[in-house]
Amino acid sequence: MSEMTPREIVHELDAHIIGQKKAKRSVAVALRNRWRRMQLDADFRQEVTPKNILMIGPTGVGKTEIARRLAKLANAPFIKVEATKFTEVGYVGKEVEQIIRDLTDIAIKLTREQQMGKCRQRAEEHAEERILDALLPKPKNDWDSTDSDANSNTRQIFRKKLREGQLDDKEIDIDVAQPQVGIEIMSPPGMEEMTNQLQSLFKNMGQAPAKRRKMKIKEAFKLLIEEEAAKLVNQEDLKEQAIELVEQHGIVFLDEIDKICKRGETSGPDVSREGVQRDLLPLVEGCTVTTKHGMVKTDHILFIASGAFQMAKPSDLIPELQGRLPIRVELDALSADDFKRILTEPHASLTEQYIALMATEGVTIEFAESGIESIAKAAWQVNERTENIGARRLHTVMEKLMEDISYEASDKSGSSFVIDADYVSAHLDNLVQDEDLSRFIL
């Protein structure tokens, strides 16, 4: 898991997300508390439960982007899900326990990569021996010591050449394990155990024998390393470690939680809204979920929920779920100045992306200060007049602004363009001023 301090986490998030200090600090503290909890005594550690977070803010201000960046920083099992994708147990659709199953699959993959990384050196040695066996088959009769010594010397010469890369382009015939065909079986609630047994049965039936293939040594070496590393990984230990990782360090990001709030009086069963909230409750407060890898306890999994809450309020969530999200963070709406910073400050900003894309065609693009101000102002004005979609409006405005250059770039190699206030005005003013055009085009 990540050992970064809250200040380091916020600094890393600042490189990609403009503003929203409160949200960044809350997320950073929650992530650091995962590490702090693991430093406690085992008995006391069980009593410390995570403080789940509810992020509230209009669309396009950075809620989902914080989740994406946090996934890379966490170095722990992390899953982002849309709350709208789930329905109440017993109805058609995904049930919420699938979140934990998917999170466990992510942990298995993460743990497998870590374990394969640890035994990579041994795997490389085994792969090297297999390639040398293909280049220099061992003699059937081993009784002649002279031939044996000569073969050993030749093997060392080839080993040296192999390590120096002199044999990379040489082709060899080698037996490579065939990839297994995965079979996914949908099961009704309560029958997961039977489904897991069926999947194991099909998996064993579908194991194809190794196939002899002709390939270059460089490609064969990579494949054999993966194959040998997989053999060295103990599957039972892998599952135990992965489940431990999920239970102690897992993070679930629930996006669009406002869309499952109950709106007004409804007569029928609300299976995709209040029903989902009721099903989420046991997960958030702690329960045991059956997965194909084993039983997973959710008591110490951190849940971060987010929503725009434009058509609903946080108080529209069922009271029990509100109580399980004690930390509330409100994200601020973006101003024209924020748009200007978004265009220039983040790593791989929008302007840098367009400059790099056009450079592949030999076209030089320069964004003048006045041009960036005009783009930010145009995006902000359209948001104010029509639907406010936050920073996502910049993508629409930039694409419309760069449309002509992008279309003609392949025919104008060596050309240079300066995007200043006049250029922006010429291409966007009519669209920005005309509310009907803004609504449909920008």
From Swiss-Prot:
Protein's recorded name: ATP-dependent protease ATPase subunit HslU
Gene: hslU
GO cellular component terms, A-Z: HslUV protease complex
Localization annotation: Cytoplasm
Annotated keywords: ATP-binding, Chaperone, Cytoplasm, Nucleotide-binding, Stress response
Spans traversing the lipid bilayer: none
Binding site for ATP: I18, G60, V61, G62, K63, T64, E65, D255, E320, R392
Any GO molecular function: proteasome-activating activity
SMART domains assigned to the protein according to its UniProt record, in alphabetical order: AAA (SM00382), ClpB_D2-small (SM01086)
Organism the protein comes from: Shewanella sp. (strain MR-7)
Free-text function comment from the UniProt entry: ATPase subunit of a proteasome-like degradation complex; this subunit has chaperone activity. The binding of ATP and its subsequent hydrolysis by HslU are essential for unfolding of protein substrates subsequently hydrolyzed by HslV. HslU recognizes the N-terminal part of its protein substrates and unfolds these before they are guided to HslV for hydrolysis.
Record text on subunit structure and interactions: A double ring-shaped homohexamer of HslV is capped on each side by a ring-shaped HslU homohexamer. The assembly of the HslU/HslV complex is dependent on binding of ATP.
One GO term of the biological process aspect: protein unfolding
Family: Belongs to the ClpX chaperone family. HslU subfamily.
Residue ranges, annotated region (Disordered): 136-156
